[in-house]
């Protein structure tokens, strides 16, 4: 983090922020405390149902058109909770899931496509 912060274009704006704790508690609190927040890249790596549903409920509405939402364990039997949360909150007929040719394990979609 310290190295990444060295190349900030605007020294007064943090590029990264780590929030430690239970995601089911910290994500809703973080969103409430930061009403200005927009998310251009939402990378979901929880594997389990509860934290995935929490992040989708609270952060997905903050992803604008053109923003990217990515999952690392989508449609994997071992981590079915991530897929269950995805299917519960998102209309799979309206989302065009994509994969990287260099990393087929990551699924993503672009908001508004």
Language-model regions: role of each:
Residues 1-113:
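S-adenosylmethionine/decaboxylated-SAM
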